[in-house]
Amino acid sequence: MDPELQAIREARLAQLKNNSGGTNGDRNSGANNGGGENSAPVGAAIANFLEPQALERLSRVALVRRDRAQAVETYLKKLIATNNVTHKITEAEIVSILNGIAKQQNSQNNSKIIFERKDFSEDLNSFDKQNAKNDDDEDDDDFFD
């Protein structure tokens, strides 16, 4: 059996044990759930509004990117609170929400650096003008004249 597949299965099993009401204080399952920041697993509050495949997808995303899974959950909670959900959310809709959140986070992280340089000829002209003024002021101090 593939070791990555085994790790995913073990993480999912630990998550299912957490969901079944394991309040015995098991710290290992909290670590597998993304650091145990929240005692409730991702998607538990909105599970009634998700299809099983969508909940599974959200759970798998939470294993890798807990922040994005929580952002999806927050977004869906807002939709539910405003009664904008008329059907169970599908896996495809979860994927599209995830893509939107990823684009939003990437656009916030991207910064644009703009270089504005002066024209060299303008600097040279201003330098020549300054030197011409300085030469006029120092006519009586010329050593070689």
UniProtKB/Swiss-Prot annotation:
Keyword Phosphoprotein attributed: yes
Modified residues (Phosphoserine): S121, S126
Molecular function via GO: DNA binding
Ranges of Polar residues composition bias in the record: 16-27
Keyword Transmembrane helix attached: no
GO biological process: apoptotic process
Biased composition (Acidic residues): 135-145
Pfam families with a match to the protein in the record: dsDNA_bind
Modification N-acetylmethionine occurs at: M1
A GO term from the CC aspect: cytosol
Note: Present with 2550 molecules/cell in log phase SD medium.
Family statement drawn from the similarity comment of this UniProt entry: Belongs to the PDCD5 family.
Protein name: Uncharacterized protein YMR074C
Species classification: Eukaryota, Fungi, Dikarya, Ascomycota, Saccharomycotina
